[in-house]
């Protein structure tokens, strides 16, 4: 399924705008090491919307008792007209409610499609820890530049 997910994301709007979680730099450790462990513990899941056995949309979620964390979604642009991402998201919202979840968290990213459904927002803060050394100071300096660029 990983090949299908990467293919979907690569051609999706997130892939074109380089906002993808699967195709970005540094995603290998998450998807090959952490995600399988979280899934084995029941703390993450992947759902897919299929048409004639072919995945046209997928969603990755973080799961805890009473909590559904909407981590990532992507869909094939050829099916945009039928809103496969929205259909999958709505299916998972309904499923989470039926399973007794009291919180559906859209997590990071204030995308328009999330704003249509959310009832509130939380502020996020980045933390960057560095060792006390020349390399640590350099890392701290670089992180400040990156943070300023991202804010602009």
Language model regions located:
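A conserved beta-strand-loop-helix scaffold within acyl/acetyltransferase catalytic domains
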Residues: 1-81
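Short, high-confidence coil segments that cap the C-terminus of an alpha-helix
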Residues: 43-44, 98-101
